Design a protein with these regions (language model features):
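Bacterial N-terminal signal peptides that target proteins for export
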Residues: 1-8
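Sec-dependent, cleavable N-terminal signal peptides
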Residues: 13-14
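C-terminal motif of bacterial Sec signal peptides marking the signal peptidase cleavage site
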Residues: 18-19
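Ser/Thr/Asn(+Pro)-rich, low-complexity disordered segments
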Residues: 28-386, 390-394
Length: 394
C-alpha cells in the first residue's frame, strides 16, 4: 500500500506546505542529508497537513485559496472547491494509510465530508465548482456558472470512489460510509449533461441559464476521467458513442507530431503540448500503466512524453527566464503575477512561472528528474527560510 500511497499523495500534490520543518516542527535538514524516501515522506506529510489542518472547518473540504497572511480581500476564506477537494480526499486517504493520523480520526473526517456533500447544492447529481463551506450553497464560479460542473464533479468522484474502495471491507462504520459514498456516486446524472442526448458531454448546466455556457468537451485535455466515469456509472451511464464521438471526435483526437523533438500521439486542445495538469488530474484514480485504446497505444508513455516535453522546453528556456533548468522546470495551471493562468510549454503561454506541483506531481512519470526538482526546491526553501514552495491551481 505504500507504493499506492506515494502515487496518490504525490500525484495529487497541490502544494508542499510546510516543507521547511520536520515532522516535529523543528528546523529542517538539508536535503543532501535525507534519503529519497525521507525527502518524499516529508513532502507527503506536509501535503497531507495542508488538506488536514487547512480544511474549511464545517465541511472538511479544501479551501479554494490559501493566503499566508490570513487576509482575504474578497471575504472568501470559507469558499471550498469540489475538484480540489477530490485531490485532498486522496491525500488524506494516503495519510491515513501511512499513519499520519489514526484510522478512527481519518474516518471521522471522511464522515464529516460526506455529510456535507449529502446536503450541499447539487444539480442533477453534479456538484458546482465552488460552495460556501459554512452553508453548502453554491458560490458562482462566473456570471452564468452557478450550477453543475461535470469536470470538477468527476475530480471529486474519483477521490470519493478511492475512499469507498478503502473502506468497503472494513468495520461496520466504515462499510456504512462506503454505502453513503456509493449513493452519491449513483446520483450523478451523467446523461443529463449530454444536453439532449447528444454524443458529447457538456461542462456546465445552470438552473438559471440552462446550457448558455455552451461548452461541449473534446479531448485531449484534463477531462478524460469525466468520460470514463460517465461510461462506468451503474445508474446513468452514457453509451460508448459519447466517448468516441465526443471525447475522441471520431478519431480527430489522434494527431502524431513532435514537440521539442519528442513524439506525441494525441491532439492537445488549443496547443501542441498542454500544461502538466493534463497529464495528472485524470490519472489520480485511473492508472495509466497498461491503459490504451484505439486512439492511443499507451497513455502512460503519452503522459510521460508530455512531461518530458515540458521539461525540455524549460531547459531550452527560449524566453531566457532566470532559474529555469534541469533542476527547476514544470509549467502547469497556477497563479502568476497576473492572476490564474494555464502555463504551457510554448512562448505564448509561458509566463516564467515554475509551479512546484508540476514537476513534483510528475514523479510517477519522471522519478529521477522530479526528485532533482524536489531537492532543489527543498534547498531553496532552507536558503530563504520561506514557509514552503506552494501553488494553488484549482
Amino acid at each position: 500500500m505504500k507504493k499506492l500511497s506515494l502515487y496518490i499523495s504525490l500525484l495529487c500534490l497541490i502544494l508542499t506546505a510546510g516543507a521547511c520543518k520536520n515532522k516535529t516542527g523543528g528546523p529542517a535538514t538539508a536535503s543532501s542529508e535525507l534519503t529519497d524516501d525521507a525527502l518524499m515522506d516529508t513532502v507527503q506529510h506536509r501535503t497531507f497537513l495542508y488538506f488536514w489542518e487547512g480544511a474549511e472547518p464545517n465541511s472538511g473540504l479544501a479551501p479554494e485559496r490559501y493566503h499566508v497572511d490570513g487576509v482575504y480581500p474578497q471575504n472568501d476564506a470559507n469558499v471550498v472547491t469540489s475538484g480540489g477537494s477530490g485531490f485532498g480526499i486522496m491525500a488524506i486517504l494516503a495519510g491515513i494509510d501511512r499513519g499520519y493520523v489514526t484510522r478512527e480520526e481519518g474516518l471521522a473526517r471522511m464522515e464529516r465530508i460526506v455529510s456535507f456533500l449529502e446536503k450541499a447544492d447539487r444539480f442533477h447529481g453534479a456538484y458546482p465548482h465552488w460552495w460556501y463551506g459554512d452553508t453548502g450553497k453554491v458560490k458562482p464560479f462566473g456570471q452564468k456558472d452557478n450550477g453543475g460542473d461535470l469536470v470538477e464533479t468527476a475530480f471529486l468522484m474519483q477521490g470519493l470512489l478511492a475512499v469507498h474502495q478503502y473502506y468497503i471491507n472494513g468495520n461496520e462504520k466504515e462499510k456504512a460510509l462506503a454505502a453513503r459514498i456509493d449513493q452519491i456516486w449513483k446520483d450523478v446524472d451523467w446523461n443529463w449533461y449530454r444536453n439532449g442526448d447528444q454524443n458529447v458531454l457538456y461542462w456546465h448546466w445552470s438552473p438559471t441559464y440552462g446550457w448558455e455556457m455552451d461548452f461541449p468537451i473534446h479531448g485531449y485535455n484534463e477531462c478524460m476521467i469525466m468520460y470514463i466515469l460517465a461510461a462506468a456509472s451503474p445508474t446513468h451511464g452514457v453509451p460508448a458513442a459519447v466517448y468516441h464521438d465526443g471525447w475522441a471526435q471520431n478519431g480527430a483526437i489522434v494527431s502524431p507530431h513532435k514537440v521539442e523533438g519528442i513524439e506525441l500521439h494525441l491532439c492537445y486542445q488549443g496547443t501542441e503540448a498542454g500544461p502538466l495538469f493534463w497529464a495528472q488530474y485524470s490519472f489520480l484514480g485511473l492508472d495509466p500503466v497498461g491503459l490504451k485504446d484505439e486512439y492511443c497505444p499507451s497513455y502512460f508513455h503519452e503522459m510521460r512524453n508530455l512531461t518530458l516535453v515540458n521539461r525540455a522546453y524549460c531547459i531550452r528556456n527560449p524566453k531566457h527566464y532566470k532559474g529555469f533548468g534541469p533542476n527547476c522546470w514544470g509549467l502547469t495551471a497556477s497563479y502568476s503575477v497576473d492572476g490564474y493562468a494555464a502555463h504551457s510549454p510554448n512562448e505564448q503561454d509561458d509566463k516564467g512561472v515554475i509551479s512546484p506541483t508540476a514537476a513534483l506531481s510528475s514523479i510517477v512519470y519522471t522519478p529521477e528528474y522530479s526528485m532533482q526538482v524536489m531537492r532543489h526546491l527543498y534547498n531553496i526553501c532552507l536558503l530563504y527560510t520561506s514557509p514552503s514552495p506552494r501553488d494553488r491551481s484549482v
